[in-house]
Each structure stands twice: as C-alpha cells, then as structure tokens.
Amino acid sequence: MFNLSALPFDIDCIAADFSINGNFKEYNALNDGHINSTYVVSFDDKGETVKYTLQKINTGIFKNPDALMSNIVGVTTHIRSALLKAGRDADRGTLTFLKAADGKYYFRDENGDCWRVYKYIDKVYTCNIIDSAEVFENAGRAFGEFQRQLSDYPIDSLFETIPKFHDTYSRFLDFMSAVKEDRAGRAEGVRELIDFAVARENDTHVLLDLIERGSLPLRVTHNDTKLNNILFDRDSNDGICIIDLDTVMPGLSLYDFGDSIRFGANTAAEDEKDVSKVSLSLPLYEAYTRGYLSSAKDSLTETETEYMAFSSKLMTYECGIRFLGDYLNGDVYFKTDYPEHNLVRAKTQFALVADMEKKMDEMRRITENALK
C-alpha cells in the first residue's frame, strides 16, 4: 500500500474532483517531458485496472490554464469528430480529457497547482531516436494526418499561448539585441557566427510577407513536432495519436513541417561538437516528406507545398539564432550541461542551414515528386 501523504499529488482530492471511480492502486512518473510533471495513475474499479494520465500544468510557462485547455479540448474534440466520421477508433486516435467538478478541464488544488487528467492509451509506444527512414515516414504521416484533420478548424477560436513563437523576424530582432548588449562579453569571440546570421536576415521576412499578402493561410499548428510526441501502435507501428498539445495555436503548417526536418533529418545530434558530421539526410527528408504529404497534401495550398523545403532551412536558422542569442545573454533560457553548450548547438544549426542551402534544389525536387 502507498502512503498517500507521501505522493507528489493529493490523489483523493484529484480523483474526487474528476469523478474517477475505484480505489487508487499505483502511479509511475514519466520523465520524457521537460515542462509538465506527468504521471500514469492506476485505479482498481470493481476488479478492473483503469489507467489515467495525470499532469501538473506548468503555470510558470502557461500562465492562462483556461486558454490552454480551451485550445487543447477544442482541437481534440474536433479530431475525435473526424475520426468517428471516418469509422476509426477515436479513443486511441486522440486524447480524451476528463471534466472537473466546476466544468473546467483542470483542477486547481489548495496549493494553487493546476492538474489535468486524460484517459491512458494502452498498447502504444513512443520513440526518441529515428533509427530508420520507415520510422520517420510514419512520423510524417502522423503529423500530416494531424494537419489534415484540423484543416477546417476555426482558427479564430484558438488562443496564442506563446506570442510570436515562430515570428522569425521578431526572433532576429531579439538576437540582434543580444549582440548589441553582449551581456556575457562573448560577442567578439563568435563574430563569424553573428555575420552568418546577419547575412540571412532577408530569410526572416519571407513567410511573414506571404502571410501579410494573404498567400499563406493560418492553420492549427502543434509547434513541438518531435518524434516522441507521437504514440505508435504496438501492433501496426503506425503513428495513431499526437500528444503534448500545450503549444497548439495559430501558425503555419510550414512551421511544423520545417521543425520536423530540422531535428529529424540531421545526420548528427543537436549538440554535436564536430560540425563535419552535420548534414541534411536527403533520404530522411524524402521519407518524412512522402509520409507527410500522403496524409496532408489534399488539405494544403500550392504555396504551402512550394515553401516546404525553404521552411526546413528557416526553422533551423531560427533555432540557431535562439541558441546563439542565449549564449550571448549568458545562457539564461536553454538548459546547458557545460559553458559552451549553446554555442555548440548554434554551430550545429548553422552548419545544417549551410548544407540545406547546398541541397535546396534537390529538396524541392523531392517535394515535387512526393506531390505526384
């Protein structure tokens, strides 16, 4: 038996507020997430074990839990409707959140902490490493399906939980402020990297200008399209459910696609010190693009598909200037393991940008072929 007073949460209070039946059995902490505290909790309900996922929302980052949960529940409800219309298993294809006693989808405890609960999806697994083109193609198919399912979602009903998250020009201005202020006295030693970033300032306007002209539609975007945010079915290996929806908000489909390529098609780790190992894997780019477009192409505009290759470079560049800017500011945002960590990350991103520029024509050809 657990000593309930030793638990990192008041399970009796939470269970009562979310009307969870049965007796609490056990819990396991999940350590994959970096923002919220997540637990799988099990209850014995008349001899049957029922599992739920319990999360403490990080209100230091997500200061408006009402807006946050409005986005998430709106999106998951929309996906559920699409799955049911298609005759598919909606309980496995999207997250199902429980409603608290006050009608909201989170519960605030006596300490002021906010908790949410959704039904646990069984017989699935997550991946942290892309060990084959097949895995990455399945990931592309899953995120493409996510985009397709939400292509008719009313964008005006979404809240912007993190303002200007992928406004690359705004990120560039933040970077230039970091260069000018040079708080950590590091700018002189990285002048070559600063020049690399400044030389590509014009790229930061491209997608924003297309939005301004009405050439790119705002979509529901996930904004954290990592491999481990997909639940894969244990039997079929298909990506069946997209999770970690905290950063769902209005944006461009190109942001999600480009960021997937940035982290997934790099031949080296994000913090590889030997930049000669850094390059864009064209086979992985092709695999993800093929999977993504197999699901999403009918819901995307011609302009969106035209800029898919470019968006891969832009998201990589944006990440690079964020790492370098944080290095210049004294490493105040990203967690680092050693003093030069953000600098190493920036060098890796810029090396990937340079390689993408060399391969841009081939990336565009691959995209065009995947559309046929």
Describe the role of every protein-language-model region:
Residues 1-11:
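Generic start-of-chain signal for non-secretory N-termini
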Residues 3-5, 21, 28-32, 55-56, ...:
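ATP-dependent phospho-/nucleotidyl transfer catalytic cores
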Residues 12-23:
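A short, low-complexity linker immediately N-terminal to eukaryotic Hanks-type protein kinase catalytic domains
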Residues 26-30, 34-44, 48-177, 253, ...:
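Conserved ATP-binding subdomain of kinase catalytic cores across diverse folds
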Residues 63, 232-300, 336-342:
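Active-site Asp-x-Gly
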Residues 305-315:
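Small/polar glycine-rich anion-binding or flexible loop at a beta-alpha turn
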Residues 321-336:
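Zn-dependent metallopeptidase/amidohydrolase metal-coordination segment
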Residues 356-359:
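Long, compositionally biased intrinsically disordered regions
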